[in-house]
């Protein structure tokens, strides 16, 4: 079975407070990837999630941009992506780490809940693929955590379904991931 992890495809990262043209451009690619998933693919989403104390966190001090506040429009998974999954629901997770069905919320760049799931359930997968936003922050954090949790697992990142904070940061991060034996396509 394949695991497809879609990182932080949320409104604030696409066309909201931290949105970009590059992020908007990958939405159709991610939708297509979801639509093409079959019954042998488990799709998991992550959602960057912040609360009223964001300004007091290290991230809030270093990135003082209001984004992905819990239960706001900017926090929601982009509608094209959530609708694609509703139209093609692959497998549904019943796991306490996943608060909202196949979605895990996270308050940091990398998700320890996702890694706990991989440590427990990784033996059920033949491969893991990652895509989403932002390549140079949350995607790379989760990919390298997965590499540490499952050192012998084939892991792929689809670069056509990722966007970074800048094109240069995106490309540099893809190079780093290749160095860590991640298959970048």
Task: Enumerate the language-model features and the residues they cover.
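Short internal beta-strands
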Residues: 44-47, 154-161
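Extreme N-terminal starter segment of soluble prokaryotic enzymes
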Residues: 1-4
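Active-site alpha/beta core segments
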Residues: 28-127
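Histidine-anchored nucleotide/phosphate-binding helix
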Residues: 31-36, 140-150
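A short helix->loop->beta-strand "cap" motif at the edges of active sites that frequently abuts
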Residues: 39-41, 150-154
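Conserved N-terminal glycine/acidic-rich loop preference
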Residues: 103-141, 163-185
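Acidic/histidine-rich helix-loop elements
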Residues: 14-22
